[in-house]
């Protein structure tokens, strides 16, 4: 048990946190001013860095809270045969997720830190809340993270329905729930596993 605890601690220490991003509100406001839109529409800034980063997909719940899939693993732990051509022949033979993991192990010495490269960064789900009704998110928190196993791809899709948050991050379709209402997912279940068998997948998951 002691050695297992030490292994977990070592694994956690190797995980790099998402970068701290500079305030992006001013830049976003300037960008909004250049939008071409129907004059009947209004575009206003709801959230910008550092309250969120690298947003890929969003979903709203019944309380108008915004859940954001944030992507930090692009080309950092998620590999493909277009940028890693030495994968190509092995990748064409892959039939299972276990085959892809074996391929990563075979070529691990080509990556900084070996197999640690594939689990050093994590994608996450951010929760944005406008609690005062002012039209901007003044509260931001991490709803769920830990999507950084070697086979994990990118947190690329999110759907929120009746308190359930569905997240696509290959090889899994995840169900996330906040059962105690503290704004963090305390329940996580893989509803289906098996997506993204091959490495040539970036941009298609």
Regions found by a protein language model. Give the residues of each.
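Sec-dependent signal peptide recognition
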Residues: 1-8
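Beta-propeller domains with acidic blade repeats across secreted/periplasmic ectodomains
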Residues: 2, 13-205
């Amino acid at each position: 048990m002691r050695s297992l605890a030490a292994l977990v601690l070592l694994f956690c220490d190797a995980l790099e946190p998402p970068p701290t991003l500079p305030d992006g509100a001013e830049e976003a406001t300037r960008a909004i001013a250049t939008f071409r839109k129907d004059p009947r529409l209004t575009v206003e800034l709801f959230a910008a860095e550092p309250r969120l980063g690298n947003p890929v997909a969003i979903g709203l719940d019944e309380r108008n809270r915004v859940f954001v899939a944030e992507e930090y693993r692009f080309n950092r732990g998620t590999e493909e045969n277009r940028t890693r051509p030495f994968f190509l022949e092995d990748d064409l033979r892959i039939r299972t997720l276990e085959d892809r993991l074996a391929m990563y192990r075979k070529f691990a010495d080509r990556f900084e830190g070996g197999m640690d490269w594939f689990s050093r960064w994590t994608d996450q789900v951010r929760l944005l809340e406008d609690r005062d009704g002012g039209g901007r998110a003044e509260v931001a928190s991490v709803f769920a993270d830990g999507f950084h196993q070697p086979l994990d791809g990118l947190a690329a899709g999110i759907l929120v329905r009746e308190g359930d948050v569905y997240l696509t991050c290959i090889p899994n379709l995840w169900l996330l729930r906040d059962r105690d209402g503290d704004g963090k997912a305390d329940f996580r279940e893989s509803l289906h596993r098996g997506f993204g068998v091959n490495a040539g997948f970036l941009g298609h998951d």
